[in-house]
Amino acid sequence: MEDRQKLEQMVTEINQLQQQGETITQQIEQLNQSLADITTAQEAVKGIKNATGKQTLVPIGAGCFIETELKSEDIIVGVGSDVAIKRSREETEKTLQTDKEEVQKLIGSLTEQLQKINEYIAQKRPEAERLMKETGVQ
């Protein structure tokens, strides 16, 4: 009976860790999307340097663009809760770089956690399989 209880505990623990791993994987995917968005914004901000007074194309979605003349290098930046502020191109570049570094750190940290979880599961799985054979549980 002791082996059976140990097996049940191991299976429960492995299942919980697998769910945690799936959650972390989803978080990493979301952060990778944020990272891609930040990179796209960085490229756009760099692209307007010294472009005041020039014609440019602005994406409006679904592969559509409008042609416009850039009147300023200032950028309207969302700061949360439907609030936006005007920042210089330089300030925006710094903010985006800081945001990018924070997201990269988070991705690194979550990837490390995921790796530890996967290693732990890989370490415990053979013992769980052995106990399954010994107790006759499928």
Swiss-Prot record:
The keyword Kinase does not apply. Keywords: Chaperone, Cytoplasm. The keyword Chaperone applies. GO terms for biological process: protein folding. SUPFAM superfamilies: Prefoldin (SSF46579). Pfam families: Prefoldin. GO terms for molecular function: unfolded protein binding. It is found in: Cytoplasm. GO terms for cellular component: cytoplasm; prefoldin complex. Its main location: cytoplasm. InterPro entries: PFD_alpha_archaea, Prefoldin, Prefoldin_subunit_alpha. Heterohexamer of two alpha and four beta subunits. Molecular chaperone capable of stabilizing a range of proteins. Seems to fulfill an ATP-independent, HSP70-like function in archaeal de novo protein folding. Belongs to the prefoldin subunit alpha family. This is Prefoldin subunit alpha. It comes from Methanosphaera stadtmanae (strain ATCC 43021 / DSM 3091 / JCM 11832 / MCB-3).
